Amino acid sequence: MPGITLLGLGPGNPDQLTREAWDVLSSVDEIWLRTRQHPTVDALPPTVDLHSFDELYENGETFDQVYDSIVEKVLELGRRPEGVIYAVPGHPFVAETTCPKIARLARDEGLATVIVEGLSFLEPTFSALGLDPYPRITLFDAIELSTAHVPAFPPDIPVLVAQLYSRLVASEVKMTLGETYPDEHPVRLVHAAGTKDELVEELKLYEIDRSDHIGLLTSLYVPALGEGTSFEAFQEIVAHLRAPDGCPWDREQTHQSLRTHLLEEAYEAIEALDAGDAAGMHEEFGDLLLQIVLHAQIANEEGEFTINSLIKSIYDKIVRRHPHVFGEVQLEGVKGVLQNWEKLKEAERRDNGKKKKGLLGGVPLALPALTQAQEYQDRAARVGFDWPAVEGVLDKVVEEIQEVKNATNETELTEEIGDLFFVLVNLARWKKIDAESALRETNLKFKRRFTFVEQGASQQGRSLSDMTLDEMDALWDEAKGKERGD
């Protein structure tokens, strides 16, 4: 009768075939194999007519295409009066892409499906490693990992990477893992687990693609990186701070009480960034992350939102706002990207039933004035409201300086100096300089040199108020000379 039997061939040792699987294999005339590249195939009953889909692997452009073709063919064979036996390595539902699809589609069209269990690659792999996977281990596919930019799993949990079938894939997996794990991280390659050719290699991460034993039955075991190395662990420790047995100070905090801390940490991070201090950024970005996770924990307790909903929201926004990366939209350069960004934002507001905010409406009023001015000018320029050339900006600077000179009262002077600041910010924007950072650097330079002047006066046993301007200028020039290396 029509139907599909999905049969597991086990990890590769013919002795590990289940009794049920052997009975089925011995009672049929024809078997369709996903691949002949499996040790158990040679031990199948010689009277059985074997077919395989290896040709699809040789001619297919992607694994997805190959698997879709296999699924389609197996369903077609299953509709025959005699049905079909489809045999796969290991267990039909462990690290097998085709079987779950076949079972689902067969069920949808009312086609009978029988599952014949098989020992998966997991049990002999864990035995070879001498490892009990309980209470936790992550399973991941080498192909998926090889195409990722970063590992999509927490590093404080051991990982078993399956189907590391070639040195090329191993090299790509190594590069991805190297974004999280150190090159010297100890790992183990497990080859042909459960068969007479079983081999376990203990290597460093950077060595995995140098193994001469990599093949279709190779897996990679990556031990945990260590306690406190995942975002989830960080989330847990922050939640503990807020728990009844946590920290009294953290437990009494609210969104509003943490406002100042959030602002301070942001400015400290910017200070480290402006100083080019990598160690400082490492510390300050961590402090800033603590503030974000702490606010998310408070929000979770108050039923406002969770850290996961926060991440999902920004994830969706990034994908939505980058159709030129994650979709089929073609955009010309950065200007085209920014203009499309504004269009997408406005469309989102309409879809959410919000009033039109205006191009400048999304700029926070709490921003520092220079940053706010530059953001206003950036946004206006995106829609073409800008000088055609930088010469127009330079002329405007000269004009505003003259208007400052011509101001006759405090009100006029305040307005004209504000206009001068604004056009100077525009000049910085044209020159691709961040005005806020530029002024901050100048402030730091002034502080550094003035401190030198103070120290120079102190070394002379004098106070600044006792010194003439020429004497202070001399120390100032000395400070400048030291900075230049004179």
Residue ranges and their predicted role:
Residues 325:
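Conserved phosphoryl-transfer catalytic core
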Residues 1-116:
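Class I S-adenosyl-L-methionine
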